[in-house]
Amino acid sequence: MKPYLLSAKQLIDKVKKSELSSVDVANSFIERIEEFEKDVRAWAFFDKTSFLEKAKEADDWRLSGKPLGPLHGLPIAIKDIFKTEDMPTGYGTPIKEGQRSKNESEVVR
């Protein structure tokens, strides 16, 4: 079973049942991105290390017994038109390439 082929609901269910960890899901998506990114060029910025760290944090949170949101552990992508504190926000143009923000867009929080 390849997690990147599952629907969001299937991923969430498998993570909640501990059939998959968030790190398992992240590694599956990383494998897929690395396989096709050179041809597809879908990512303006991709930080594999941060992705894996956040997946580990999601797993730790889940295992701690703390309350979870309905999408907890599900990977998301943030289009580079939204300001983020820890990623460049290029607005899809070379003029803004590498630009960093000191605050985050509301949709990112």
Task: Identify what each model region corresponds to.
Residues 1-53:
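An N-terminal boundary/leader segment
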Residues 10-11, 106-108:
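Residues within well-ordered alpha-helices
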Residues 38, 70-107:
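Enzymes and membrane/adaptor proteins characterized by extended Gly/Ser/Thr/Asp/Glu-rich
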